[in-house]
Amino acid sequence: MIKTKICGLTEVGQALATARTGADFAGVVFAESKRRITTEKALEIAEALKPLNPRPMLVGVFANQTAEEVNRIASVCRLDRVQLSGNESWEYCNQVNLPVIKVIHVAESTTAELVIQEIQAGLKALKKTPVFLLDTHTKALFGGSGQSFDWQIVKQVSLKYPVMVAGGLNPENIQGFIKIAKPWGIDVASGVETDGIKDTAKIHLFIERVKDADGNRIC
């Protein structure tokens, strides 16, 4: 089954709605972003999700912050995983206590071979195997831009390595994306928002369409 992550949650109600869909990961942002939340709010979300069984893993999103800050917030907010969306080195990743989701930024000039080389370098350098997340490179934002990149890159990389993908995905295009790219996982933020706020109806529709497309795949 394709893994799913709803990212940029800012309220407990959004997190509970995400959990009800059966999503695998719920993301809260601590990096500079319009979706950034306080540690207090993140802890509220963690405590609301904790009694649920099953429940989505709570992922904290960071970008170019110190490893000490990342580990402190992860502990205080009872995170399950840490997503590193900046330009963090592999050495830096090894300093993070929790399992890591490492973003690989895909620019217009990026090829599938370059992505594969970066994944191979990470696997060689890291003490623990991370989840690799391919996301669109933008100058201003570390994710959540709503901009997509060449899906053929995902298709080629997925033949060799399991990857999660973000960037421009929404309920309207997700089934076409899955058919072409066949990713291990999918991450969405702006694609399930209305006027910049998480839309629970869109979250449900998105996950429903992922499950439907995944069930119709011929592996």
From Swiss-Prot:
Q: Which GO terms describe its biological process?
A: L-tryptophan biosynthetic process
Catalyzed reaction equations: N-(5-phospho-beta-D-ribosyl)anthranilate = 1-(2-carboxyphenylamino)-1-deoxy-D-ribulose 5-phosphate
Q: Does the keyword Mitochondrion apply?
A: no
Q: Which GO terms describe its molecular function?
A: phosphoribosylanthranilate isomerase activity
Which Pfam families does the record match to this protein? PRAI (PF00697)
- What domain of life does the UniProt record list for this protein's source? Bacteria
Pathway assignment reads: Amino-acid biosynthesis; L-tryptophan biosynthesis; L-tryptophan from chorismate: step 3/5
* EC number annotated for this UniProt entry: 5.3.1.24
Keywords, A to Z?
Amino-acid biosynthesis, Aromatic amino acid biosynthesis, Isomerase, Tryptophan biosynthesis
User: What PANTHER family is this protein classified in?
Assistant: N-(5'-PHOSPHORIBOSYL)ANTHRANILATE ISOMERASE (PTHR42894:SF1)
Protein family per UniProt? Belongs to the TrpF family.
Supply the name of the protein.
N-(5'-phosphoribosyl)anthranilate isomerase
Tell me the organism's taxonomic lineage: Bacteria, Bacillati, Chloroflexota, Dehalococcoidia, Dehalococcoidales
